[in-house]
Design a protein with these regions (language model features):
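Repeat-based scaffolding regions
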Residues: 1-222
């Protein structure tokens, strides 16, 4: 009986894959709904439905992924929740998905994840003229991260401003604030000197005038 059930399960997935390949959305979802009666974890059900909808470029997939990730979070399965958002973000650069991913990485204090998700979110927000939203995000996250991560995060923000917001009239202020954060960190941890130099190198490649101003600011501050 178990072998029969396993074979039926496998056949059902082959049918779903076939319907997806043939572009038959409703038939794929019909088989999926029948199959989900045998799946005990709701998060998996929503995640798989999101995968099917995503294959048909249906924006409803994002809603399913949000539900799946929230269910994983409630169950304490943080890595699964992050994986759902990462998967969704690979196929759809969505502001809400990337904001949720950023918040997840903040919660688990994953520095690389925090920085990478913020960079991706910054690009979208600045292209949509939502700079103030990003500034609020920086303020909100500042109480949740260490000083070094905060400096690196502001460096990402400055880079994004120079890349995607040519009208950023307050760029000098943001650069000076980022330099202050780095210099404060360097008082206690010289290992982050390379991070400051990376920031200056990026600045030089993107805006030579601001780079020269940054060097002057550092020389006056030290």
């Amino acid at each position: 009986m178990r072998t029969f059930a396993s074979e039926s399960y496998t056949i059902a997935w082959f049918k779903i894959a076939d319907f997806v390949a043939r572009g038959e959305k409703e038939r794929a979802l019909h088989v999926y709904r029948l199959l989900m009666h045998s799946v005990s974890e709701p998060a998996i059900s929503y995640q798989l439905e999101g995968d099917i909808l995503l294959a048909f470029d249906d924006d409803a997939a994002l809603d399913r992924y949000h539900v799946a990730a929230n269910l994983y979070k409630k169950a304490g399965k943080w890595q699964q929740a992050i994986s759902v958002y990462e998967h969704a973000g690979l196929f759809k650069e969505d502001e809400k998905i990337l904001e949720a991913l950023f918040d997840m990485y903040l919660s688990v204090k994953n520095r690389i994840g925090i920085l990478e998700s913020f960079s991706r979110l910054s690009k979208i927000c600045l292209q949509q003229k939502k700079k103030e939203f990003l500034i609020q995000l920086l303020h909100r996250s500042s109480v949740l991260i260490d000083d070094a991560t905060q400096a690196l995060l502001h460096a990402r923000f400055v880079r994004s401003l120079l890349l995607y917001d040519e009208s950023a009239v307050e760029i000098s202020m943001h650069i000076q604030h980022t330099l202050d954060l780095f210099l404060n960190v360097l008082h206690t941890d010289k290992h982050h000197e390379k991070d400051l130099q990376k920031f200056l190198s990026d600045l030089k490649s993107l805006h030579d005038y601001e780079y020269e101003q940054a060097k002057k600011y550092i020389s006056l501050t030290l």
